[in-house]
């Protein structure tokens, strides 16, 4: 993004006279030049960012239209317009990875590359990690998929997608005999590290080194040439050749410094990975009001702990290390075994606390010694870089910035604690005491007689919740059955028939799955009338689907397809009738004050818990009952009307009876006499029906719903679960089947 700015700077510079002020940068002209260049750069950058956001939206729209190449082209242009550190770069790279994944398994390596670029821009972008894990899983690189999903879970323990991938890959690895527990142990504290941040740190270190070497020279040409050669010789090119710095000058020096940055990047990343392999635990070091974080290995010794404490509290001359046992006493730790015992007793609290008590040096106990002094010093130094405010992240930070941040936050925390009198330890003790008293009190309550009735209410609610889960699961399959079929513009009839047949099998399979879930809901809760009504709707739609599909061949009463359609209509009527009956019985019990709700309400009032359930007024309940009855009768009438058409075309004499009952249901639903007359007039049995114009009951039902929609849904339906059922439109696949099989061949 620096090229346009560079051109403007060069143009402005050439127009300026080569005066001393312009050359040295000490005059006003140089300052105005910098200000104008910065303003021009900001204006251009704003334009580029706005254009990139427009390209991102265009790419999203093309992705929704399944134009993955076009979407990828827009995303790529947007990335090129944005700065490298912009927040949308990771999102755009991940979107490009999604496009590659949609284009087939052969493009998965490209998707992985885009995810890598996204993680360079934003190392903690979990979506990129998840997509890369899916690609690795599909490419059978299960160890990489295991790593990425584990890293996401380290950042977001409640991430459902990451947990699914992790468990799935873990199961396969266990089946192959791989020790996944050891792998998981090594990854439990691993966090993503950004290459951009590491590169910045390394450049800063090189800048300091260069400045130091420059100050050591005497100012002569020979001294300058030696300092430049020293820096350039320290940085090797990829093919291993050394460059003569005396002839190349400053440009080659900067290039070599960049090469050295890349080499040091790899070294820093490698050292970071090596350090992450050590499994550590989080420890709180408590010295009066001063509480500091530290990271200690799981197998750390008491000598290592002592050295870390000395490093964190350098003012202490002598001290005792203590822990609080299960009885609340502070016990002094003198050996490594005692340290491990203390860690095991406090495992359930999440963080391990060590209390430091200052004593004179001659009162300090003699700790058991270890031989690995070098590793102890190394870890003590590493732990000292952890922020005092509790920041224990794995990211590498510059020493100067880290020290400044620690000092400011620590001062603020101390000031805040002193001002408000905050004591974190007392809160934890109060919590433990409260939980102990709560457990003892609950033991007496749950064994009483009143608790058994409350348990019955809770069991009934959980039973209804389980049935509702199956009901919603069935609704998902009903929605999947509405999948639209897309035909190619230049497709032949054979291609269209293949597409239609595939769509029919898909919808039929989803209808069967939905029926299975609805039946499961009724098995869990026998009076769950919503599932019965939904089952009737499912069987009704499946009957229509099979009927339109049967039109592709000879249709008569003896054919198997016709018999299947009539059986589905019979089942749909039975489900609708049973659901209506259960609902009417529940309404009757509610009006008489003997419903389960009234029983539960009376019991809760005795226990002083009457505010748990809310109850509608009598007027609202009456309106809700009328609306529910209207909707059920409307659904039932549509079913009977469609059945009368099927029976008429099959030559069954019972078609007129079905039509009469359908009219009765529409009247009970509150349909106007004009609408009913139009519906009867356009029945396929009527001589007045328009020839070649098939009347669709779905269309008039939809019109009724839209006409009275605002009024009905303002009042509300007493069961929100049935709203998707009542608002459901007829699938377009039915019309496609009818047009393909009953139209001109």
Swiss-Prot record:
Coiled coil location: none
Subunit details: Interacts with myosin XI-1 and XI-K.
Compositionally biased tracts (Basic residues): 1-10
Gene: PHOX1
Pfam families attached to this UniProt entry: PB1
Keywords per UniProt: Cytoplasmic vesicle, Membrane, Repeat, TPR repeat
InterPro entries assigned: PB1-like, PB1_dom, PHOX1-4, TPR-like_helical_dom_sf, TPR_rpt
Gene Ontology MF term list: myosin XI tail binding
Protein name, UniProt field: Protein PHOX1
TPR repeat boundaries on the chain: 52-85, 90-125, 126-159, 406-441, 443-472, 494-528, 553-586
SUPFAM superfamilies reported for this sequence: CAD & PB1 domains, TPR-like
Chain residue ranges for the region called Disordered: 1-37
Every PB1 domain range: 280-359
């Amino acid at each position: 993004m620096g090229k346009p700015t560079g051109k403007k700077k060069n143009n402005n510079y050439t127009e300026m006279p080569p005066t001393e002020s312009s050359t040295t940068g000490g005059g006003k002209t140089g300052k105005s030049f910098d200000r104008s260049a910065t303003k021009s750069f900001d204006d251009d950058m704003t334009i580029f960012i706005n254009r990139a956001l427009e390209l991102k939206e265009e790419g999203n729209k093309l992705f929704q239209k399944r134009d993955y190449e076009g979407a990828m082209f827009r995303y790529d242009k947007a990335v090129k317009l944005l700065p490298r550190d912009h927040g949308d770069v990771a999102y755009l790279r991940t979107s490009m990875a999604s496009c590659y994944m949609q284009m087939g398994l052969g493009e998965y390596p490209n998707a992985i590359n885009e995810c890598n670029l996204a993680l360079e821009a934003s190392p903690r972008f979990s979506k990129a990690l998840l997509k890369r894990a899916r690609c690795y899983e599909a490419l059978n690189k299960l160890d990489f998929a295991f790593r990425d999903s584990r890293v996401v879970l380290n950042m977001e323990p409640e991430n459902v997608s990451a947990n699914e991938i992790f468990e799935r890959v873990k199961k396969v690895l266990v089946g192959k005999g791989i020790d996944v527990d050891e792998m998981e142990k090594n990854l439990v504290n691993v966090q993503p590290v950004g290459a951009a941040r590491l590169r910045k740190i390394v450049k800063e270190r090189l800048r300091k080194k260069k400045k130091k070497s420059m100050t050591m020279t005497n100012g002569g040409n020979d001294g300058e040439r030696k300092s430049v050669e020293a820096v350039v010789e320290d940085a090797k090119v990829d093919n291993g050749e050394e460059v003569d710095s005396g002839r190349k000058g400053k440009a080659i020096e900067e290039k070599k410094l960049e090469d050295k940055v890349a080499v040091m990047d790899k070294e820093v990343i490698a050292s970071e990975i090596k350090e992450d392999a050590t499994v550590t635990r989080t420890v709180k070091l408590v010295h009066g009001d001063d509480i500091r974080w530290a990271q200690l290995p799981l197998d750390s010794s008491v000598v290592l702990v002592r050295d870390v404490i000395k490093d964190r509290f350098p003012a202490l001359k002598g001290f005792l290390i203590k822990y609080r046992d299960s009885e609340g006493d502070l016990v002094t730790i003198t050996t490594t075994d005692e340290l491990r015992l203390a860690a095991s007793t406090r495992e359930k609290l999440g963080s391990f606390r060590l209390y430091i008590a200052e004593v004179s040096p001659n009162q300090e106990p003699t700790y058991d010694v270890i031989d690995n002094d070098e590793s102890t010093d190394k870890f003590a130094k590493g732990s000292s870089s952890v922020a005092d405010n509790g920041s224990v992240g794995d990211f590498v930070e510059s020493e100067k910035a880290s020290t400044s941040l620690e000092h400011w936050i620590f001062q603020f925390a101390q000031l805040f604690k002193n001002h408000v009198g905050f004591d974190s330890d007392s809160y934890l003790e109060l919590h433990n005491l409260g939980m102990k008293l709560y457990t003892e009190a609950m033991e007496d309550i749950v064994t009483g007689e009143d608790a058994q009735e409350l348990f019955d209410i809770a069991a009934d609610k959980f039973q209804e919740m389980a049935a509702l889960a199956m009901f919603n699961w069935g609704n998902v399959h009903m929605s999947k059955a509405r999948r639209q079929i897309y035909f190619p513009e230049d497709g032949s009839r054979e291609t269209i028939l293949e597409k239609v047949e595939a769509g029919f099998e898909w919808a039929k399979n989803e209808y069967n799955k939905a029926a299975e879930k609805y039946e499961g809901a009724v098995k869990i809760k026998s009076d769950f009338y919503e599932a019965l009504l939904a089952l009737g709707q499912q069987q009704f739609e499946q009957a229509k689907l099979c009927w339109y599909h049967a039109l592709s061949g000879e249709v008569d009463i003896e054919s198997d397809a016709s018999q299947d359609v009539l059986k589905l209509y019979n089942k749909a009527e039975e489900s609708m009738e049973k659901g209506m009956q259960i609902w009417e019985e529940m309404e009757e019990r509610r009006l008489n004050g003997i419903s389960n709700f009234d029983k539960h309400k009376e019991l809760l009032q005795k226990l002083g818990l009457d505010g748990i359930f809310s109850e509608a007024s009598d007027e609202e309940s009456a309106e809700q009952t009328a609306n529910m009855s209207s909707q059920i009768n409307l659904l039932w009438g549509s079913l009977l009307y469609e059945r009368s058409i099927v029976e008429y075309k099959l030559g069954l004499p019972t078609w007129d009876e079905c039509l009469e009952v359908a009219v009765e249901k529409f009247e009970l639903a509150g349909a106007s006499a004009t609408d009913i007359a139009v519906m009867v007039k356009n029945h396929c049995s009527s001589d007045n029906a328009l020839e070649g114009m098939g009347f669709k009951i779905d269309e008039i039902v939809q019109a009724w719903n839209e006409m009275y929609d605002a009024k009905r849904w303002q009042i509300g339906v007493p069961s929100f679960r049935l709203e998707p059922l009542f608002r459901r439109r007829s699938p377009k696949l039915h019309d496609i089947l009818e047009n393909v099989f009953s139209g001109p061949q």
